[in-house]
Regions:
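Bacterial N-terminal signal peptides that target proteins for export
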Residues: 7, 11-27
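Residue-level detector of alpha-helix boundary/anchor positions
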Residues: 7-8, 13, 33, 213, ...
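Bacterial N-terminal signal peptides
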Residues: 25-36
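Sec/Tat signal peptide C-region and signal peptidase I cleavage site
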Residues: 37-41
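Eukaryotic scaffold repeat domains enriched in small/polar residues
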Residues: 42-394
Length: 394
C-alpha cells in the first residue's frame, strides 16, 4: 500500500537521514552490493525481427519554408487520434535544398540534436492525429523554450489519474517544468527557476522526466545534474527525495526516464551507468535508504537506455549502442530484443521517447533525425512481442 502525502517527512529530516545513509553506505556497501539482485549484463535473451511495420511519411511537415522539424524529444499518445510531440525547436534548412531531402533533416545528413547552430525556438509543442496531420501547434508557449543554452524540452507527459489531463512539459535546459491545461490555453504551473540550476526544494538541475502515482503524487527525475528523484504533491510541492550521484545501488549517473509499475514499483533509467534500477514505495520500508522507498534491484548491461514503458507484467526499454528495443520481466530477465535499423527512409538514429496508444500503435520520437514515426503491429505479430499500454492502477 502506498503512503499518503500526510506521512511525508520534512526536507530537513530527510537530508539528515540521507547524510547518515551515505556515511553508513561506505561501511556496508560491499554487503548491500551482494544482496541486491542484479540481472546479468551478458544474457541478452532471445532476439529477432521487429513485430511492427513503419508507416512511411507519417509525420507530415508543416514548418514554414526554409525550416524542418527539430529533435523530437518527447511523444505521448493521449489517444489514437491525439498524439503530443515536443520538439527542440525547428531546424534551419540549407539553401539550395538538396534533392534528397525527404521531409526530415536526417535525410540530408543534418543531426537535429548536435547541429545546434541551425536550431530556432519555434513550434516546440504540437498535437497530431492518427495519420500524422497537424491538429494544433502550441506556439503561444514557444517563449518557454527561449533564452536557454541547451537542447530545451525533454519530455511531455499526462497523468492517467488526473481528471483535468494536464500536460507536463519538462525543459531540461531552463531547469524548469511547465504544466499546461489540456487545451493549451493556460499555463497552470511553473516549477523551478528559469536558467538557475540548484538542488534544493524549489530548483532543479536539468530535469528529465516525471511519473505519476495513483494518489496524485508526482515523481520528478532530476536528472542529469542532481541525480535524484523528487517526490512532490500533485501541484509540484516538494515532499521528499532519494538517490544521489554514484554507481552503487540506489545511486545514479543521469536519470533519463521514469515509470511506475504494479505494487508500487518505480523503474528509473540510470543512463550513464547503463542500467535500470527498481524501487518500491511501501509502508514497510526499512528506512535505511528512504523512509518510504526501498531499493529492489539493478538491471545492468544496457548501452545508453533512453525511455521505457512498464506494463502489467513487463518492462520495455529503448536502448542505444546499438539501437534496440528490449523486453524484460520484473526480475530483469530479457524476454525479447529487436534491433532498430537506421537504413532506408524509415530508419532511426535513436528512439529518444516512445508511446503506445489504446489501439496498440507505437510512436517513436527521433531526437537526431528530427521526426516522430508511427509503427503498427504486423498482421502476423506475436502479441507477446508487442508493447502494451502503460500500467494504470484501477
Amino acid at each position: 500500500m502506498l503512503i499518503g502525502d500526510n506521512l511525508s517527512l520534512s526536507a530537513a529530516h530527510l537530508r539528515k537521514d540521507f547524510g547518515v545513509m551515505q556515511f553508513t553506505s561506505l561501511i556496508v556497501f560491499g554487503l548491500v552490493f551482494l544482496v541486491v539482485p542484479m540481472a546479468s549484463s551478458q544474457d541478452l535473451g532471445p532476439t529477432g525481427p521487429s513485430p511492427y511495420d513503419v508507416v512511411e511519411g507519417w509525420h507530415k511537415p508543416f514548418a514554414a519554408e526554409g525550416f524542418a522539424f527539430g529533435g523530437n524529444s518527447g511523444v505521448f499518445a493521449e489517444s489514437p487520434n491525439r498524439i503530443f510531440i515536443s520538439q527542440r525547436g525547428e531546424t534551419k534548412l540549407p539553401t539550395p535544398l538538396p534533392l534528397e531531402f525527404a521531409g526530415y533533416v536526417g535525410s540530408i545528413g543534418i543531426n537535429a540534436l548536435r547541429d545546434t547552430e541551425l536550431r530556432t525556438w519555434q513550434n516546440c509543442l504540437m498535437t497530431v492525429d492518427g495519420n500524422g496531420n497537424l491538429l494544433e501547434v502550441w506556439n503561444q508557449w514557444d517563449h518557454l523554450c527561449e533564452d536557454s543554452d541547451g537542447p530545451g524540452p525533454h519530455r511531455v507527459r499526462i497523468s492517467p489519474y488526473d481528471p483535468e489531463r494536464r500536460v507536463w512539459v519538462i525543459n531540461e535546459s531552463r531547469h524548469q517544468i511547465f504544466v499546461l491545461s489540456n487545451d493549451g490555453s493556460e499555463l497552470l504551473l511553473t516549477l523551478g527557476e528559469k536558467n538557475v540550476s540548484g538542488s534544493d526544494e524549489t530548483h532543479f538541475g536539468r530535469p528529465q522526466d516525471v511519473a505519476f502515482l495513483p494518489d496524485g503524487r508526482v515523481l520528478i527525475a532530476d536528472g542529469l545534474d542532481n541525480h535524484r528523484i523528487i517526490i512532490t504533491d500533485s501541484n509540484g510541492n516538494y515532499l521528499s527525495e532519494f538517490g544521489g550521484f554514484g554507481d552503487g545501488p540506489g545511486q545514479f549517473n543521469g536519470i533519463h526516464a521514469l515509470a511506475i509499475g504494479p505494487d508500487g514499483r518505480i523503474f528509473a533509467l540510470d543512463r550513464a551507468n547503463g542500467r535500470v534500477q527498481v524501487f518500491r514505495l511501501t509502508n514497510d520500508a526499512s528506512g535505511e535508504y528512504h523512509p518510504e522507498v526501498e531499493h529492489i534491484a539493478v538491471w545492468s548491461g544496457f548501452g545508453l537506455p533512453l525511455d521505457l514503458i512498464v506494463n502489467e507484467e513487463s518492462v520495455w526499454v529503448s536502448d542505444l549502442r546499438p539501437l534496440k528495443m528490449v523486453k524484460l520481466d520484473f526480475d530483469g530477465n530479457r524476454l525479447y530484443t529487436w534491433n532498430v535499423s537506421n537504413d532506408g527512409p524509415s530508419g532511426y538514429l535513436e528512439i529518444h521517447a516512445f508511446s503506445v496508444d489504446t489501439d496498440g500503435n507505437l510512436y517513436g520520437g527521433d531526437n537526431q533525425h528530427g521526426r516522430t514515426q508511427k509503427l503498427i503491429p504486423k498482421a502476423n505479430a506475436d502479441p507477446r512481442l508487442l508493447i502494451g499500454p502503460p500500467f494504470v492502477q484501477e
